[in-house]
Protein backbone atom coordinates (compact mmCIF):
# COMPACT_ATOMS: atom_id res chain seq x y z
CA UNK A 1 0.00 0.00 0.00
CA UNK A 2 2.80 2.38 -0.91
CA UNK A 3 0.31 4.88 -2.33
CA UNK A 4 -0.31 5.95 1.29
CA UNK A 5 3.17 7.44 1.64
CA UNK A 6 3.68 11.21 1.92
CA UNK A 7 3.61 12.67 -1.63
CA UNK A 8 1.22 9.87 -2.59
CA UNK A 9 3.60 7.26 -3.96
CA UNK A 10 6.30 4.71 -3.32
CA UNK A 11 8.87 7.29 -4.45
CA UNK A 12 8.69 9.20 -1.17
CA UNK A 13 11.09 6.58 0.17
CA UNK A 14 13.94 7.05 -2.29
CA UNK A 15 13.47 10.83 -2.34
CA UNK A 16 14.12 11.16 1.39
CA UNK A 17 16.84 8.52 1.40
CA UNK A 18 18.81 9.86 -1.57
CA UNK A 19 18.61 13.51 -0.55
CA UNK A 20 19.74 12.75 3.00
CA UNK A 21 22.59 10.54 1.75
CA UNK A 22 23.70 13.39 -0.51
CA UNK A 23 23.66 15.78 2.45
CA UNK A 24 25.74 13.41 4.58
CA UNK A 25 28.30 12.94 1.82
CA UNK A 26 28.59 16.67 1.11
CA UNK A 27 27.09 16.48 -2.37
CA UNK A 28 24.13 18.71 -1.50
CA UNK A 29 24.52 21.99 0.38
CA UNK A 30 22.33 24.87 1.50
CA UNK A 31 21.38 27.05 -1.46
CA UNK A 32 21.71 24.26 -4.02
CA UNK A 33 19.02 23.27 -6.50
CA UNK A 34 17.96 19.64 -6.76
CA UNK A 35 17.22 18.64 -10.35
CA UNK A 36 15.59 15.36 -11.37
CA UNK A 37 14.15 13.85 -14.52
CA UNK A 38 10.86 12.15 -13.73
CA UNK A 39 7.62 10.94 -15.23
CA UNK A 40 5.98 12.39 -12.14
CA UNK A 41 6.07 10.49 -8.87
CA UNK A 42 9.75 10.95 -8.05
CA UNK A 43 9.48 14.59 -9.05
CA UNK A 44 6.54 14.99 -6.66
CA UNK A 45 8.39 13.20 -3.87
CA UNK A 46 11.62 15.13 -4.26
CA UNK A 47 9.68 18.39 -4.45
CA UNK A 48 8.10 17.50 -1.11
CA UNK A 49 11.45 16.71 0.54
CA UNK A 50 13.07 19.80 -0.98
CA UNK A 51 10.27 21.96 0.44
CA UNK A 52 10.78 20.57 3.95
CA UNK A 53 14.56 20.98 3.80
CA UNK A 54 14.60 24.39 2.11
CA UNK A 55 16.14 23.49 -1.24
CA UNK A 56 15.08 24.77 -4.63
CA UNK A 57 13.71 22.02 -6.86
CA UNK A 58 13.64 21.68 -10.64
CA UNK A 59 11.61 18.81 -12.10
CA UNK A 60 12.20 17.88 -15.75
CA UNK A 61 9.22 16.00 -17.21
CA UNK A 62 8.13 14.90 -20.67
CA UNK A 63 4.82 16.09 -22.04
CA UNK A 64 1.83 13.78 -22.33
CA UNK A 65 1.59 12.75 -18.67
CA UNK A 66 -1.15 13.57 -16.17
CA UNK A 67 -1.41 17.27 -15.35
CA UNK A 68 -1.95 16.38 -11.70
CA UNK A 69 1.67 15.24 -11.53
CA UNK A 70 2.82 18.65 -12.73
CA UNK A 71 0.47 20.46 -10.35
CA UNK A 72 1.62 18.50 -7.29
CA UNK A 73 5.29 19.38 -7.80
CA UNK A 74 4.37 23.03 -8.31
CA UNK A 75 2.25 22.96 -5.14
CA UNK A 76 5.41 22.01 -3.22
CA UNK A 77 7.14 25.07 -4.70
CA UNK A 78 9.12 23.31 -7.42
CA UNK A 79 9.77 24.60 -10.91
CA UNK A 80 8.61 22.16 -13.59
CA UNK A 81 9.96 22.17 -17.14
CA UNK A 82 8.55 19.90 -19.83
CA UNK A 83 11.06 18.37 -22.23
CA UNK A 84 10.34 15.76 -24.88
CA UNK A 85 7.21 13.71 -25.49
CA UNK A 86 6.00 11.00 -23.07
CA UNK A 87 9.35 9.25 -22.54
CA UNK A 88 11.95 10.78 -20.20
CA UNK A 89 15.03 10.35 -22.40
CA UNK A 90 15.44 14.04 -23.29
CA UNK A 91 14.64 15.15 -19.75
CA UNK A 92 17.27 12.74 -18.48
CA UNK A 93 19.93 14.19 -20.76
CA UNK A 94 19.17 17.72 -19.52
CA UNK A 95 19.20 16.52 -15.92
CA UNK A 96 22.65 15.00 -16.35
CA UNK A 97 23.92 18.21 -17.96
CA UNK A 98 22.60 20.45 -15.19
CA UNK A 99 23.83 18.06 -12.50
CA UNK A 100 27.40 18.86 -13.55
CA UNK A 101 26.84 22.61 -13.11
CA UNK A 102 27.81 24.40 -9.87
CA UNK A 103 24.89 24.80 -7.48
CA UNK A 104 22.95 21.80 -8.78
CA UNK A 105 22.58 18.28 -7.44
CA UNK A 106 21.05 15.54 -9.61
CA UNK A 107 20.09 12.38 -7.68
CA UNK A 108 19.72 10.51 -11.01
CA UNK A 109 17.15 8.00 -9.81
CA UNK A 110 17.53 5.76 -12.89
CA UNK A 111 21.25 5.17 -12.29
CA UNK A 112 21.90 5.76 -8.60
CA UNK A 113 22.66 2.65 -6.54
CA UNK A 114 21.21 4.40 -3.48
CA UNK A 115 17.82 3.71 -5.05
CA UNK A 116 18.47 -0.04 -4.83
CA UNK A 117 19.95 0.30 -1.34
CA UNK A 118 16.85 1.99 0.08
CA UNK A 119 14.56 -0.68 -1.29
CA UNK A 120 16.77 -3.51 -0.06
CA UNK A 121 17.63 -2.09 3.37
CA UNK A 122 14.31 -0.45 4.26
CA UNK A 123 11.26 -1.32 2.16
CA UNK A 124 12.29 -4.94 1.71
CA UNK A 125 12.91 -5.35 5.44
CA UNK A 126 9.57 -3.76 6.35
CA UNK A 127 7.72 -6.15 4.06
CA UNK A 128 9.57 -9.18 5.45
CA UNK A 129 8.47 -8.28 8.98
CA UNK A 130 4.82 -8.31 7.88
CA UNK A 131 4.79 -11.52 5.83
CA UNK A 132 3.30 -14.67 7.39
CA UNK A 133 5.78 -16.86 5.50
CA UNK A 134 8.91 -16.53 3.40
CA UNK A 135 8.34 -14.76 0.06
CA UNK A 136 8.41 -16.94 -3.02
CA UNK A 137 8.16 -14.22 -5.67
CA UNK A 138 8.14 -10.45 -6.00
CA UNK A 139 6.84 -8.71 -9.10
CA UNK A 140 7.31 -5.00 -9.73
CA UNK A 141 6.99 -2.59 -12.62
CA UNK A 142 10.21 -1.14 -13.95
CA UNK A 143 10.43 2.62 -13.80
CA UNK A 144 13.96 2.89 -12.46
CA UNK A 145 14.15 -0.78 -11.48
CA UNK A 146 15.25 0.15 -7.96
CA UNK A 147 12.17 -1.21 -6.21
CA UNK A 148 11.99 -4.64 -7.81
CA UNK A 149 15.77 -5.19 -7.73
CA UNK A 150 16.18 -3.93 -4.15
CA UNK A 151 13.19 -5.75 -2.67
CA UNK A 152 14.07 -8.88 -4.64
CA UNK A 153 17.56 -8.78 -3.16
CA UNK A 154 16.17 -8.49 0.36
CA UNK A 155 13.84 -11.43 -0.23
CA UNK A 156 16.53 -13.66 -1.71
CA UNK A 157 18.63 -13.08 1.40
CA UNK A 158 16.02 -15.00 3.43
CA UNK A 159 14.86 -17.36 0.66
CA UNK A 160 17.40 -18.09 -2.05
CA UNK A 161 14.65 -19.64 -4.16
CA UNK A 162 12.56 -16.46 -4.28
CA UNK A 163 11.99 -15.19 -7.83
CA UNK A 164 12.15 -11.59 -9.03
CA UNK A 165 9.82 -10.70 -11.92
CA UNK A 166 9.85 -7.41 -13.81
CA UNK A 167 6.57 -5.96 -15.08
CA UNK A 168 6.29 -4.01 -18.34
CA UNK A 169 3.35 -2.86 -20.50
CA UNK A 170 2.69 -5.39 -23.25
CA UNK A 171 2.66 -2.49 -25.74
CA UNK A 172 6.16 -1.40 -24.73
CA UNK A 173 8.25 -4.32 -23.48
CA UNK A 174 11.50 -2.37 -23.63
CA UNK A 175 13.74 -4.54 -21.45
CA UNK A 176 12.49 -7.94 -22.55
CA UNK A 177 12.02 -7.26 -26.27
CA UNK A 178 13.56 -3.90 -27.12
CA UNK A 179 10.24 -2.26 -28.01
CA UNK A 180 9.51 1.39 -27.19
CA UNK A 181 5.91 2.47 -27.72
CA UNK A 182 3.41 4.75 -26.02
CA UNK A 183 1.28 3.20 -23.32
CA UNK A 184 -1.05 4.29 -20.50
CA UNK A 185 0.67 2.89 -17.42
CA UNK A 186 2.40 6.04 -16.21
CA UNK A 187 5.49 5.56 -14.08
CA UNK A 188 6.88 2.43 -15.73
CA UNK A 189 8.55 1.71 -19.07
CA UNK A 190 9.89 5.21 -19.66
CA UNK A 191 11.36 4.52 -23.10
CA UNK A 192 14.83 3.19 -22.29
CA UNK A 193 16.62 0.60 -20.17
CA UNK A 194 17.63 2.26 -16.87
CA UNK A 195 21.22 2.00 -15.68
CA UNK A 196 20.07 0.10 -12.60
CA UNK A 197 18.57 -2.61 -14.81
CA UNK A 198 21.62 -2.70 -17.10
CA UNK A 199 23.80 -3.44 -14.05
CA UNK A 200 21.44 -5.88 -12.35
CA UNK A 201 19.52 -7.60 -15.14
CA UNK A 202 21.01 -10.90 -13.99
CA UNK A 203 18.92 -10.55 -10.80
CA UNK A 204 15.67 -10.64 -12.80
CA UNK A 205 14.29 -14.17 -13.09
CA UNK A 206 11.44 -13.43 -15.49
CA UNK A 207 9.16 -10.87 -17.11
CA UNK A 208 5.41 -10.38 -17.18
CA UNK A 209 3.59 -8.08 -19.60
CA UNK A 210 0.19 -6.48 -18.96
CA UNK A 211 -1.75 -4.30 -21.42
CA UNK A 212 -2.64 -0.73 -20.45
CA UNK A 213 -6.36 -1.27 -20.91
CA UNK A 214 -6.33 -4.32 -18.63
CA UNK A 215 -4.47 -2.27 -16.04
CA UNK A 216 -6.97 0.59 -16.11
CA UNK A 217 -9.93 -1.79 -15.89
CA UNK A 218 -8.34 -3.49 -12.88
CA UNK A 219 -7.59 -0.10 -11.28
CA UNK A 220 -11.30 0.75 -11.50
CA UNK A 221 -12.27 -2.65 -10.08
CA UNK A 222 -9.92 -2.20 -7.12
CA UNK A 223 -11.61 1.10 -6.26
CA UNK A 224 -15.17 -0.21 -6.62
CA UNK A 225 -14.68 -3.56 -4.90
CA UNK A 226 -12.04 -2.81 -2.28
CA UNK A 227 -12.33 0.94 -1.73
CA UNK A 228 -8.67 1.42 -2.60
CA UNK A 229 -8.05 4.43 -4.84
CA UNK A 230 -4.87 3.85 -6.84
CA UNK A 231 -3.36 4.44 -10.28
CA UNK A 232 -3.08 2.24 -13.39
CA UNK A 233 0.26 0.72 -12.41
CA UNK A 234 -1.37 -0.76 -9.31
CA UNK A 235 -3.93 -2.46 -11.54
CA UNK A 236 -1.10 -3.90 -13.62
CA UNK A 237 0.74 -5.07 -10.50
CA UNK A 238 -2.29 -6.88 -9.11
CA UNK A 239 -3.04 -8.65 -12.40
CA UNK A 240 0.60 -9.71 -12.70
CA UNK A 241 0.77 -11.00 -9.12
CA UNK A 242 -2.42 -13.04 -9.46
CA UNK A 243 -1.35 -14.44 -12.82
CA UNK A 244 2.08 -15.52 -11.59
CA UNK A 245 0.69 -16.96 -8.37
CA UNK A 246 -1.66 -19.16 -10.36
CA UNK A 247 0.72 -20.11 -13.17
CA UNK A 248 3.59 -21.00 -10.84
CA UNK A 249 1.42 -22.46 -8.07
CA UNK A 250 2.82 -20.22 -5.33
CA UNK A 251 1.55 -19.22 -1.91
CA UNK A 252 3.38 -15.98 -1.09
CA UNK A 253 3.67 -13.41 -3.88
CA UNK A 254 4.47 -9.76 -3.17
CA UNK A 255 3.65 -6.76 -5.34
CA UNK A 256 3.04 -3.03 -4.91
CA UNK A 257 0.26 -0.46 -5.10
CA UNK A 258 2.60 2.34 -6.12
CA UNK A 259 0.61 5.56 -6.26
CA UNK A 260 -2.71 7.19 -5.46
CA UNK A 261 -5.63 7.54 -7.86
CA UNK A 262 -6.01 11.31 -7.57
CA UNK A 263 -3.45 11.76 -10.35
CA UNK A 264 -5.58 9.79 -12.80
CA UNK A 265 -9.10 11.16 -12.54
CA UNK A 266 -9.38 11.20 -16.35
CA UNK A 267 -8.96 7.39 -16.32
CA UNK A 268 -11.71 6.79 -13.79
In which residue ranges do the predicted regions lie?
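PLP-dependent amino-acid enzyme catalytic core
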Residues: 1-268
Amino acid sequence: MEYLNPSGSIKARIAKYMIERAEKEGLLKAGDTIVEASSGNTGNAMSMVAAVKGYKMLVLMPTGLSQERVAISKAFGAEVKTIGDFHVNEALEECRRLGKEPGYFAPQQFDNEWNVNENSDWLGQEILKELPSKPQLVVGGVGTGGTVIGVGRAFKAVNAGCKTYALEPSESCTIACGEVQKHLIEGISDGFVPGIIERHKNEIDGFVHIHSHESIDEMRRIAKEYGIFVGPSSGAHLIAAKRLKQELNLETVVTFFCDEGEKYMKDY
